[in-house]
């Protein structure tokens, strides 16, 4: 239907559509259409939106009045320039004017032009549309003389007030109405019909088509003839905004609205005073009736006083809400205004005008605007909607979550990542189908992302922390990779999200919407883990961000600080529960613990927290007390029977852990919680007290002996000590074999010590295999290998073992025996350097490892600069001193090795300086030099140049470059030393985790532990052990711990809010708000003074009338049967006291009494 209508209209308008090229300074281009007064507004609207490509407006403001001869006041021009254009700019509005270059329309066009030049966003565009009568256009014949395919050239002229005017070059579109001479004013009627039609159209933010276009008329000044247009628009329920102080009809309406009385006499008096010339009595009567009818629709009238009210966009929105309130109290009727408030991001107006309590909102009413607030990044509105009834658990479905990901801006980094994953997926599907180009499937359809791409992006950022996210949805599984879900899959997307706050937090933080993400973090569960996840994502995205500003904002995100502060709040409340918070397996993050997520995010500051270090200390010492001295530990290690004495003291948990076997029903006692949370889960401790009492004393003694033995040797500190001692023994054995007992190949060797060394290395290999492949059953072998190789110390182990295997293989053959010795000697050096790893546990030596690592990186950069000078000097001196020596080994020795020795002071002057060269026999014969019979003679032709180059080389390398290296080392040391404590604590965690997971026995005895674990895995399938760093709590206790964390989070947020209120900036803002309120109150006092002055004038008028009546009765012959009543004493006394002052009082200016000029008083604005 629309297309047929368009074709019919195009035929009707053939030759009446065209472009205009404005000549002059501006040189702009516009579009025009010439219509008749009977043209359907729907067809004109179709031309604007379909043929000319204008987006449907989010607001239409029709400028009425302001085309008078009087000069515009400066403040009025500023209001229109700044206020109206700003309000239109925030939404992409249409501004309808007369389109002619005179009066206020000209000033408004200039404001639109300034906005267009300053605006950088093509989406937010202010469109100025002129609706002008054809017969009032200067040079209108030029618009008809142009060819159909060529724009009309139109000169812009500033003409004086008269019958014709030029079109304003700052307007982009014109609707030129060809009026019938028999029907004057058809242009005004066309404007009224156009506004009515636009107000019935629907548009939406985000393309939802859900909002009726709000239309508003702005009255500036205005002649009486505008009242007819105003009344017709009011009959169409279009609200009006009246600009106070602009003069004309606008001031008349403002005055009457302030007085609250619009009797005919008062209205006529105001008309006569405002327009003293050119009005007949019949016109005054007609205008008076129109004014009274207009004022009867006060709900559609709003006054804007630029001196007192807020900005114009605020007043426009209030006017629209006011018009809606007067018509209905249903929530559905306020959705358009609410959506407009969302579009303008005016949450203050939404709170004060829409959510004031007059309207009852349901969750279903707010779902649509909630989506718009999410898509358009309006966190204040999201918070407002949640506070007013939106239930996130009911609101967020997988379908809506997918729509949120599909709405990501193309300029956002997330869009690039999702697009990349989608292209990889399409390429994979194309390879399976063997169909060539993977993009053929896309066509011209709108691009959409699925959860497959989202899960892949999260996998890149969070690794196993997001395992299973959005990967098991029925729609995704049945869709088979298609971009759009089939109809039978759509109902699956209506399923509600299991963790809505987590999903929204991830969606917001992936787009770097930090304020939105902060709100979702504050509302969601497991806040410490979520903050660390946000820290990890922000760090990863900061590396990928191409724009410096985005990368800087991502790096400045304070999610690690949030995690630290919240954990501090938890730790100060309860240390035991805080420990459990660190090691419990989370529900929302794929069973990962807080410590796992912190490790993934490399949150060094979080690990440096006292609470985290206290837990690590407890884990490090195992069941032993943390105040056990090292001397006692060493003594017990070498004399194991001391473990059953009081030399080693254990924690009291072993006495409480007997309750572990009881059901997890009693959770109200803190002691019971500690027993459940902090026990090490020893199977021996799980026996009931009754069974213990029934056993014999000998059985009890054996159990205690075995328990203390197991607790001592399974502690990570004991495991570490055993590994260190045995590793030193390994290095001693290795050095002994290399130096004293490295026998020839079989049958002479190897010796018994060397065979023991081979077996020792074999146990080391078994341990490395266990660490790499026997860690997580759910992980693929390739993934396990990748994680193993990522650790630098594991790389060192792989190099050491590989060299040992190569050396052992070469050592067994006589031909490669010496090569095998060489390789094993180098391998010993690698094994010895592996000792650096044990320093990480020491508080002073641990940071030094980081310093050495950083300095090695600095050395590589230094060597680049050094090699440039070294090669330049070495090659040059070799060419100058020994041009006849063709031996390659000596060329490299003199060109590279000798200049390198110069740096350390080894300068053989007898080989460089001709004055100190010895008189030895030498030759210049190449053959003798190659045979080595005589040394080559140095060339002394340019020996002075060699000396000069040596001086420059030593100056640059020994003074400049070496001092540069020292400065780099000093800077690295200073940076690391400032954060030495943080680096050490992070290293310490990794070391504790490593030795916590290691078997109790050290190599080579570790093979016993490996055999034991293998047998247990075959017999019991799973090991019956509890990991102190990963605990899966019972559901009741886990829920209680989550509730406790939520309470601490609320306390933390309350403290943040209190600190924010007490900050100097917030206090200044609060004081400023109070001052503004006081100023508004003072402005109200002025209004009251004006009202009181009016009342005084009226009372004085009434008194004079009464005095006149009394005097008339007194002079007449009429008499009353009784005497006149006497005035009360208070009034009489007051009259006598105030009589002298009243005699001298002057009448207020602008409020004359009836007795002086016989005119009714009115308030003069």
Swiss-Prot record:
Ranges for region Disordered: 1122-1165
Chain ranges passing through the membrane: 716-740, 752-771, 793-811, 819-841, 851-880, 943-977
InterPro entries: Ion_trans_dom, TRPC_channel, TRPM, TRPM_SLOG
Residue intervals on the Cytoplasmic side: 1-715, 772-792, 842-850, 978-1165
Activity control, per UniProt: Ca(2+)-activated cation channel. Displays voltage dependence modulation. Regulated by PI(4,5)P2 levels. PI(4,5)P 2 reverses the Ca(2+) -induced desensitization of channels. Is highly temperature-sensitive.
Subcellular location, record wording: Cell membrane
Residue list for modification Phosphoserine: 121
Biased composition (Basic and acidic residues): 1156-1165
Residues annotated for Ca(2+) 1 binding in this entry: 212, 324, 333, 336-337
UniProt main location, coarse: membrane
Quaternary context: Homotetramer.
Domain commentary: Contains two Ca(2+)-binding sites that are allosterically coupled. The binding site in the intracellular domain modulates the voltage dependence and the accessibility of Ca(2+) in the transmembrane domain.
Annotated function: Monovalent cation-selective ion channel activated by intracellular Ca(2+) in a voltage- and temperature-dependent manner. Mediates the transport of Na(+), K(+) and Cs(+) ions equally well. Activated directly by increase in intracellular Ca(2+), but is impermeable to it. The activation mechanism of TRPM5 involves a multistep process.
Family per similarity comment: Belongs to the transient receptor (TC 1.A.4) family. LTrpC subfamily. TRPM5 sub-subfamily.
Protein's recorded name: Transient receptor potential cation channel subfamily M member 5
Taxon lineage: Eukaryota, Metazoa, Chordata, Craniata, Vertebrata
């Amino acid at each position: 239907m629309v297309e047929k209508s368009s074709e019919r209209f195009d035929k009707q308008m053939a030759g009446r559509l065209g472009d205009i090229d404005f000549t002059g300074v501006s040189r702009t281009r516009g579009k025009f259409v010439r219509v008749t007064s009977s043209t359907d507004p729907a067809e004109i609207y179709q031309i604007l939106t379909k043929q000319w490509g204008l987006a449907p407006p989010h607001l239409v403001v029709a400028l009425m009045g302001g085309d008078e001869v009087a000069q515009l006041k400066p403040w009025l021009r500023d209001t229109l320039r700044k206020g109206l254009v700003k309000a239109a700019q925030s939404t992409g509005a249409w501004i309808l004017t007369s389109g002619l270059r005179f009066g206020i329309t000209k000033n408004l066009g200039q404001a639109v032009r300034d906005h267009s030049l300053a605006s950088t966003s093509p989406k937010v565009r202010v469109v100025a549309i002129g609706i002008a009568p054809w017969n009032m256009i200067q040079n209108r014949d030029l618009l008809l003389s142009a060819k159909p395919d060529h724009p009309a050239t139109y000169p812009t002229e500033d003409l004086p007030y008269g019958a014709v005017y030029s079109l304003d070059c700052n307007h982009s579109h014109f609707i030129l109405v060809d009026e019938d001479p028999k029907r004057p004013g058809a242009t005004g009627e066309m404007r009224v019909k156009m506004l009515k039609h636009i107000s019935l159209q629907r548009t939406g933010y985000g393309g939802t088509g859900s909002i009726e276009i709000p239309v508003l008329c702005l009255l500036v000044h205005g002649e009486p003839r505008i009242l007819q247009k105003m009344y017709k628009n009011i009959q169409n329920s279009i609200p009006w905004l009246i600009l106070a102080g602009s003069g004309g009809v606008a001031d008349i309406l403002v005055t009457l609205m302030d007085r609250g009385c619009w009797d005919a006499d008062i209205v006529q008096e105001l008309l006569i005073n405002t327009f003293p010339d050119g009005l007949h009595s019949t016109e005054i009567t007609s205008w008076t009736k129109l004014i009274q009818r207009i004022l009867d629709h006060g709900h559609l009238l709003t006054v804007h006083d630029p001196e007192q009210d807020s900005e114009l966009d605020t007043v426009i929105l209030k006017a629209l809400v006011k018009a809606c309130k007067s018509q209905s109290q249903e929530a559905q009727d306020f959705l358009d205004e609410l959506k407009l408030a969302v579009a303008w991001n005016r949450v203050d107006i939404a709170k004060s005008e829409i959510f004031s309590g007059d309207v009852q909102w349901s969750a279903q009413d707010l779902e649509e605007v909630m989506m718009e607030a999410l898509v358009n990044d309006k966190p204040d509105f999201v918070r407002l909607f949640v506070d007013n009834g939106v239930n996130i658990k009911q609101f967020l479905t997988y379908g809506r979550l997918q729509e949120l990901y599909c709405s990501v801006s193309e300029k956002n980094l997330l869009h690039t990542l999702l697009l990349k994953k989608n292209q990889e997926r399409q390429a994979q599907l194309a390879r399976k189908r063997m169909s060539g180009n993977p993009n053929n499937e896309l066509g011209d359809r709108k691009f959409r992302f699925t959860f497959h791409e989202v899960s892949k992006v999260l996998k890149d950022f969070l690794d196993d922390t997001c395992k299973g996210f959005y990967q098991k949805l029925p729609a995704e599984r049945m869709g088979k990779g298609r971009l759009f879900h089939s109809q039978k899959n759509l109902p699956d997307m209506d399923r509600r999200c299991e963790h809505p706050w987590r999903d929204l937090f991830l969606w917001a933080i992936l787009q770097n919407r930090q304020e939105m993400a902060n709100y979702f973090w504050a509302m969601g569960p497991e806040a410490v883990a979520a903050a660390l996840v946000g820290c990890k994502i922000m760090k990863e995205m900061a590396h990928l961000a191409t724009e410096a500003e985005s990368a800087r904002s991502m790096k400045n995100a304070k999610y690690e600080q949030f995690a630290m502060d919240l954990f501090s709040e938890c730790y100060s409340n309860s240390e035991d529960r805080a420990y459990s918070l660190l090691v419990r397996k989370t529900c929302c993050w794929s069973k990962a613990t807080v410590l796992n997520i912190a490790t993934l995010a490399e949150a060094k500051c979080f690990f440096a927290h006292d609470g985290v270090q206290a837990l690590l200390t407890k884990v490090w010492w195992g069941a032993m007390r943390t105040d056990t001295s090292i001397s006692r530990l060493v003594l017990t290690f070498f004399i194991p029977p001391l473990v059953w004495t009081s030399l080693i003291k254990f924690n009291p948990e072993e006495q409480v852990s007997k309750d572990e076997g009881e059901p997890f029903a009693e959770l109200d006692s803190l002691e019971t919680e500690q027993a459940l949370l902090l026990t090490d889960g020893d199977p021996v401790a799980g026996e009931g007290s009754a069974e213990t009492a029934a056993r014999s004393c000998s059985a009890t003694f054996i159990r205690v002996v075995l328990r203390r033995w197991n607790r001592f040797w399974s502690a990570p500190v004991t495991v570490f000590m055993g590994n260190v001692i045995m590793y030193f023994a390994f290095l001693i054995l290795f050095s002994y074999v290399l130096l004293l007992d490295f026998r020839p190949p079989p049958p002479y060797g190897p010796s018994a010590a060397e065979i023991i060394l081979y077996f020792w290395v074999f146990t080391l290999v078994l341990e490395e295999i266990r660490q790499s492949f026997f860690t997580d059953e759910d992980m693929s072998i390739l993934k396990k290998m990748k994680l193993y190789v990522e650790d630098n110390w594991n790389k060192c182990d792989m190099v050491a073992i590989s060299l040992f295997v190569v050396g052992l293989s070469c050592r067994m053959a006589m031909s490669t025996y010496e090569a095998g010795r060489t390789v094993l000697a180098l391998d010993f050096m690698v094994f010895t350097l592996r000792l650096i790893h044990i320093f990480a546990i020491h508080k002073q030596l641990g940071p030094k490892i980081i310093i050495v690592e950083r300095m090695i990186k600095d050395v590589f950069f230094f060597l680049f600069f050094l090699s440039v000078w070294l090669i330049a000097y070495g090659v040059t001196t070799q060419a100058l001193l020994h041009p006849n020596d063709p031996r390659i080994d000596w060329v490299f020795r003199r060109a590279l090795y000798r200049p390198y020795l110069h740096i350390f002071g080894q300068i053989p002057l007898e080989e460089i300086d001709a004055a100190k060269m010895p008189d030895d026999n030498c030759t210049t014969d190449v053959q003798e030099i190659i045979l080595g019979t005589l040394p080559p003679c140095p060339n002394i032709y340019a020996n002075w140049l060699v000396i000069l180059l040596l001086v420059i080389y030593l100056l640059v390398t020994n003074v400049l470059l070496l001092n540069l290296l020292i400065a780099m080392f000093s800077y690295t040391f200073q940076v690391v030393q400032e954060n030495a404590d943080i680096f050490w604590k992070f290293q310490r965690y990794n070391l504790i985790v490593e030795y916590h997971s290691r078997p109790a026995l050290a190599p080579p005895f570790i093979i016993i532990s490996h055999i034991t674990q293998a047998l247990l895995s075959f017999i019991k399938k799973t090991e019956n052990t509890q990991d102190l760093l990963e605990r899966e709590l019972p559901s009741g206790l886990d829920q209680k711990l989550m509730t406790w964390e939520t309470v601490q989070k609320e306390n933390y947020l309350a403290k943040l809010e209190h600190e924010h209120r007490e900050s100097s900036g917030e206090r200044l803002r609060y004081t400023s708000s109070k001052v503004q309120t006081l100023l508004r109150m003072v402005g109200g006092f002025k209004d009251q003074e004006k009202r009181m002055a009016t009342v005084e004038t009226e009372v004085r008028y009434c008194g004079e009338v009464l005095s006149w009546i009394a005097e008339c009765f007194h002079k007449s012959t009429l008499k009353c049967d009784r005497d006149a009543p006497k005035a009360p004493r208070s009034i009489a006394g007051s009259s006598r006291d105030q009589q002298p002052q009243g005699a001298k009082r002057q009448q207020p200016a602008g409020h004359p009494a009836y007795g002086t000029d016989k005119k009714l008083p009115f308030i003069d604005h």
